[in-house]
Amino acid sequence: MKKKYRLMLLIIILLIIGGIIFYKKSIKNSKTGENKNSQEIIDYILNLSSYKTKITVNITSNKNNNKYILKQEFKGNKENIQEVIEPSNIAGIKIINDGTNLKIENSNLNLNTIIENYTYLGNNCLDLSTFIENYKVNNKSNYEENENEIIMKTIVESDNIYVKEEILYIDRSTMKPTKMEIKDDKQKTRIYILYNEVEINM
C-alpha cells in the first residue's frame, strides 16, 4: 500500500515538474516571435517606439568599398543619435537629430556644430527608422517569408540613383532585424548593414 502511495506521489510530482517546464517554455516562446504570425511581426517592427543598435556598414561605390561600425539610438520623436565607432580616424563623431536641428559633435576634435531647420533630417538611409517610414508610405512595400525570416522590401522615392530599394531581414524567433540591403537603380547592393546588437523598445 505504501509503495503504491509513493509511486502515485512520484507520478504526481513528475507531472507537476513537467507542467512547470512546459509552462516556462511556452512563456519564453510567447515573449519572442515563436507564436507570432508574419503580419504581427511586421506590425511590431513598424511600430517601434525606441531602439539601440550596433551595426557594421559596408558601402560600395564605383571605385572602392568602405566599412564602418556605428552605434544608433532612436528615441521616437525626441532624439536620434548616430555615433561612429570605426574607423579610428573618425571615431567619436556623433550626429544628433532632434527632429528640427542637426547637431554634429566630436569631443576628440573639439567639434560642435548645429545646423538649424535642416531639411533632410529624414534622409539617413542607414537608419532603421528611415526604412520604417519608407515602408509605411510606399504602396509598393511588400514582404516575403521563409521558415526562419521575414524579408520586408520597399522602394525609395528619391533622386539618388544609389538608393532605390531597401530590403530588411527580420529573424522570426527574436523579431529583430539581422541585416539590411540598399540597392541602386540597377539592383546592385550599394549598402549592406549587419545588425550586430539590437535592443528594442527599451
Predicted regions span which residues?
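Beta-turn initiation residues at beta-strand->coil junctions
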Residues: 57-59, 84-87, 105-108, 156, ...
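An acidic-aromatic
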Residues: 71-126
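Amphipathic hydrophobic-ligand
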Residues: 64-70, 91-97, 161-162, 188-191
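Gly/Pro-enriched, hydrophobic low-complexity segments
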Residues: 143-202
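A short, amphipathic edge element
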Residues: 130-142
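N-terminal leader/targeting segments and the immediate start of mature chains
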Residues: 2-76, 202
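Short, solvent-exposed coil/turn segments at beta-strand boundaries
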Residues: 47-52, 72-80, 96-101, 147, ...
